[in-house]
Regions:
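Carbohydrate-interacting regions of secretory-pathway proteins
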Residues: 1-120, 227
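Beta-propeller domains with acidic blade repeats across secreted/periplasmic ectodomains
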Residues: 116-460
Length: 460
């Protein structure tokens, strides 16, 4: 029913989700086609954007940019004007939150353009090469455009012990790909499904003769947490799945990347601030004395975002290969997705801002952080975020600005000029940017200074 149309009083449900409906002069609705994307995933406890386009007798609903209902209403008593009203339907106790409500009056060509711009189903296609800007001397090539209707949305990749790519669908399973030769592309026949019964993998790495994956399942069809996947019978197919640690996570601030340690003895698990802290070993590096620590009354987010989520925020765990011992290596992050070690064994991550805090004193931009053992980075609920000058809160190496951080990696081994081989690459999902972060040891401290460069920029 998400995105359907329910008419006033006795008319009731006129058009359900995915339906194109025409109501005749006799008031009877007829389903004349389908609209929308039946693979679209909508999470009811996260913010969703509802768009209603009403022009004459035509009304279209969209959720998160995808059309959910298209109605042509010729009913003799159909309303053509009125008021905007927000209501709860009768039934069991429930909560509905609204924000950023905007009303735009459409007239003439604007009204026609609003209707004409709506498509039934855009589908996933790769950004055209001519819409991608790269640093001078570099060139981008399209290897494969993922068909969203059959292979979902790919959110993570790694290489296995034979140099093949393993990729994950955000709401589906895994695929295996043999990388093509230089100048060649991939076709549908090159994409192999992995038989392992696993889904919603947000992070993965090949280590200790196995594939370790972090599951973060919005739809709760599979328990989130850390899993190990192996080949049970030597047929070169990953088919055995072991859950090493179940974790409680919510939304896209959950269980994320898995990173191997430089000494090859452990793993680092990256989690966002909506992951409930798990049981820790006594050797955990972060002192378990954190708290919200507000001298003045707390001021949670005025829009209601994460009002009940308190310290310690996002945690980086150090984990043994069997997943039995979890140590909190560092915490106090908002929503880190990935991390990477440099040649000296120093760990770096890219933390998120809180976009609703923009222009308030406690706003903290997305930032590159050097993560040291036992460190606290000061994320707290609402207005309680710790400024960088607090003595018990480590500052970032570099502030980036507004964005949505995802993957990070160093360029070691790439056939790039030395400057770019040594760079840390940080991907910003919301602005479609890949930054090259150029780090330099600071002679006046034990940390680094850094500058950023827009290495790749894409436009949808």
């Amino acid at each position: 029913f998400f995105g359907m149309l329910y008419a006033e009083k006795w008319r009731g449900i006129v058009a359900k989700r995915f339906q194109r409906v025409v109501v005749g002069d006799d008031g009877k609705p007829e389903v004349v086609g389908e609209v929308g994307d039946k693979d679209q995933k909508i999470v009811d406890d996260e913010w969703n954007e509802l768009t209603i386009i009403a022009v004459g007798n035509r009304q279209i609903h969209q959720v998160n940019g995808v059309t959910t209902m298209d109605l042509t209403d010729n009913h003799p008593e159909a309303k053509r004007k009125g008021i905007l009203a927000l209501q709860l339907h009768a039934g069991k106790p429930m909560t509905v939150e609204f924000k950023d409500i905007r009303l735009r009056h459409l007239k003439g060509e604007d009204a026609k353009a609003a209707i004409d711009s709506v498509t039934e189903k855009a589908g996933n296609t790769a950004t055209p090469i001519d819409r991608i800007k790269v640093a001078k001397g570099f060139k981008a090539e399209l290897l494969y455009s993922v068909p969203g209707d059959t292979q979902g949305s790919w959110v993570n990749l790694c290489t296995d012990n034979k140099g093949r790519l393993l990729v994950s669908d955000q709401f589906g399973g895994l695929y295996r790909i043999t990388p093509p030769a230089a100048g060649e592309t991939l076709g549908a026949a090159d994409i192999q499904s992995v038989p392992a019964d696993i889904r919603a993998v947000n992070g993965m790495v090949w280590a200790f003769d196995a594939l370790y994956v972090a599951v973060n399942d919005y739809e709760r069809k599979m328990t989130s947490g850390l899993y190990r996947i192996t080949d049970s019978d030597g047929d070169d197919q990953l088919d055995k799945v072991e859950c090493l640690r179940q974790m409680e996570a919510k939304g896209d601030h959950g269980v994320h990347a898995v990173v191997p340690s430089p000494d090859g003895k452990s793993l680092f698990l990256i989690t966002g601030n909506n992951t409930t802290p798990t049981e820790l070993a006594e050797t955990s590096q972060v002192p378990q004395v954190w708290g919200e620590d507000h001298l003045l009354p707390s001021m949670p987010d005025g829009r209601g975002h994460n009002r009940a989520r308190l310290a310690p925020g996002g945690i980086i765990y150090k984990v043994d290969p069997d997943g039995k011992n979890f140590e909190a290596y560092a915490n106090g992050f908002r929503n880190i997705f990935d991390a990477a070690f440099n040649r000296d064994g120093e760990l770096f991550t890219y933390d998120a801002d809180m976009e609703y805090d923009f222009n308030v004193p406690w706003y903290r931009p997305t930032r590159i952080c050097q993560v040291t053992s036992g460190a606290e980075f000061g994320w707290r609920n609402g207005a309680g975020k710790r400024p960088t000058f607090y003595a018990d809160n480590l500052p970032p190496v570099l502030d980036i600005g507004p964005g949505s951080p995802t993957g990070v990696t160093f360029g070691y081994g790439a056939k790039f000029p030395a400057k770019y081989q040594n760079a840390l690459y940080a991907l910003d999902w919301s602005w479609g940017k890949l930054y090259a972060i150029h780090l330099k040891l600071d002679p006046n401290s034990s940390s680094y200074t850094a500058t950023k460069e827009e290495f790749v920029t894409g436009a949808p």
